[in-house]
Amino acid sequence: MLHTLHRSPWLTDFAALLRLLSEGDELLLLQDGVTAAVDGNRYLESLRNAPIKVYALNEDLIARGLTGQISNDIILIDYTDFVRLTVKHPSQMAW
């Protein structure tokens, strides 16, 4: 399943998101959700321990001036890759 986090993790039920993640799921951080990828924050540590791949939309990182602050554990993608993820995962959950 593809999970998309478009809101700030501080404004989301992040604990519920973590509970619903399963091995093999993928999480895409976009819009304000990219703040979860900033190195050193508590949400990133939880994502590192989850059995998933985590992506961030590079355009949203650039728009927020965060490109130099993102953890190396996060896979940066563009809109074409975003489309590929949505095609790969017929089931999606938006947060």
UniProtKB/Swiss-Prot annotation:
GO cellular component: sulfurtransferase complex
Keyword tRNA processing listed: yes
Protein's recorded name: Protein TusB
PANTHER family per UniProt: PROTEIN TUSB
Gene: tusB
Subunit structure comment from the entry: Heterohexamer, formed by a dimer of trimers. The hexameric TusBCD complex contains 2 copies each of TusB, TusC and TusD. The TusBCD complex interacts with TusE.
GO biological process, one term: tRNA wobble position uridine thiolation
tRNA processing found in the keyword field: yes
UniProt organism field: Escherichia coli (strain K12)
